[in-house]
Amino acid sequence: MPEDDVRNKFLDAGDSDDDAGHGSDSEDDFQKGGRNAKRRRVSDDEDSEADDFTDAEEEHDQDDAESKDAPAKDGQETTDGKEKKDGKKEKEKKSVLASDLPGMTKPLTKKNLIVTEEAIKKSGVVYISRVPPFMTPAKLRSLLEPYGKLNRIFLAPEDPVARRKRIRSGGNKKKMFTEGWIEFVKKKDAKKACELLNARPIGGKKGSYYRDDIWNLLYLKGFKWHNLTEQIAAENAERSSRMRAEISKTTKENKEFVRNVERAKVLQGIQAKKASKGSKAGGEGAAQVTESTIPSAAATTTTTTNDDKRRTFKQIPLAKKRKLDETQPEQVQRVLSKIF
């Protein structure tokens, strides 16, 4: 008895969650006692333990659900954090590339580096007499930048008539440039580039488009960029003056043509009125007789008379003044002879 009481007090009341899963062992232990009262109490205790176990399972399920939600949220937060980190890394890479390669992102929108008189004196201009086919200013800049700092590039485009003819004959529609001028910030770089590259192939990779083309470079001594702009401005002014002269000439010709057309219309109206008046005055019979007798001669004479009779405007001659030496009448002479 005392052993059973001790076992029931300490073992039944102090069942932990770990012992709840071992129901078979506890049932074997209770069967050893062999008493109904003990079994009833054990069954009650088992019901309470089962309720506790179900409550524990529900709490465990809730904890699992919360734990599942928590990692999902943590995963979202981690992905957002990773994306932010990746964006920061890309920005840092772009900034590093921009710092390593200044001016390579927008090579054609650079500011003018040569402004002061000292910079103008130090600058040098190189003339390229033949631009390789379909080479753009950006490509030319990328090829010449390793040999010195460049400022401005000007390439003369192909003649539009020649371009149209080339495209019509099945050629490429890309832009072509015939010649160009490159401005170096330092004239010594321009001289070295001309000495090194002139009459030599462009080179590069084996499959590059301009690998076998040859450089045609000439350093222009004493030539500055403003001389080029002045030359271009002079050519543009000459072209505009020529165009103005041609336009004035064509306007004069057009005005003269319009004036002649209006005069011809007036003369035709006058001739039509004269013909209508003559037909009314002459009568129909005489006109029929003349037309039946000599129709061809009448037609020729009318055409000739109409053509010959042109309206001419002449000034009326002025009245002549009396001469002093004219002979005076006899009465006047008689009176004058009596007086004098």
Curated annotation (Swiss-Prot):
One of its GO terms (cellular component) is nucleolus. Residues 124-214 form the RRM domain. Its main location: nucleus. Residues 1-103, 272-329 are annotated as: Disordered. Coiled coil: none annotated. Pfam families: RRM_1. CDD domains: RRM_ABT1_like. One of its GO terms (biological process) is endonucleolytic cleavage in 5'-ETS of tricistronic rRNA transcript (SSU-rRNA, 5.8S rRNA, LSU-rRNA). Belongs to the ESF2/ABP1 family. Involved in the small subunit (SSU) processome assembly and function, and in the 18S rRNA synthesis. Required for the early cleavages at sites A0, A1 and A2. This is Pre-rRNA-processing protein esf-2.
